[in-house]
Amino acid sequence: GFSVPFPGTLTSALMLSDTAAKENYGAIRVMGGGYVNTELRSLSDGRIFDFVDFITFDDGQLPLERLCDLKEGRCSHNDLVRTVYRRDDGTLAERLNVDCNIPFGQLPPPDFSDFDRTHYISLTELTNPMHKLWSDGRWNKMTVAHGCYHKKCAFCDTSLDYIGRSDAPSPEIVVERMEHIVAQTGIRGFHFTDEALPPALLAGVCRLIVERGIAV
């Protein structure tokens, strides 16, 4: 699967997807991400499916789970969620079901067990201290809650699911995820990537960190 957050990453994702198909015949190629969510919701030209098999929108957990079920023969195309694909006759099929989501608190923590971060360099793109803060050094990137708790800024597209649908887990779940990630990575610095996480949730997380004596 390829997450395409910006227009500048689209071409490389399509090239890699095309290479993956040639190297691994039968693999399902899936594309999602921020650019897809904002720019590809109204597809009329199916040529992009020369490079990918499926395009998914918004949260990818359930769409990807259904695609795995489809490949294993456990469901049909009609069971797909927030997914677009090209039929054999060249027409495009949409299976949206936009309200189907796995609650954020029920998702498992990310698995870094076989991810060796020593193979990656620390990169500082700009001298701006704000940008350097979250890119210089190795940080555990983590989303504390789904969406934005405020979602009232005039400059923001609050119609997008990853902004407009707020879904926050309990502080206990957040701290347990943090402990799990630290145990796997050995890295104790965290960069929360939320649009705007609930202050009450963050306060609860901080209290638990202090109570449990967790060094982060």
Language-model region placement:
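A broadly conserved sequence feature marking short terminus-proximal activation segments
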Residues: 86-129
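Radical SAM [4Fe-4S] cluster-binding motif and immediate context
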Residues: 113-216
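Generic alpha-helical secondary-structure signal
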Residues: 66-67, 110, 177
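General N-terminal targeting signals
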Residues: 17-19, 46-48, 72-73, 110, ...
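Generic secondary-structure boundary/loop-capping signal
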Residues: 81-82, 101-104, 109, 145-146, ...
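Glycine-rich beta-alpha loop elements in corrinoid/cobalamin-binding modules
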Residues: 1-103
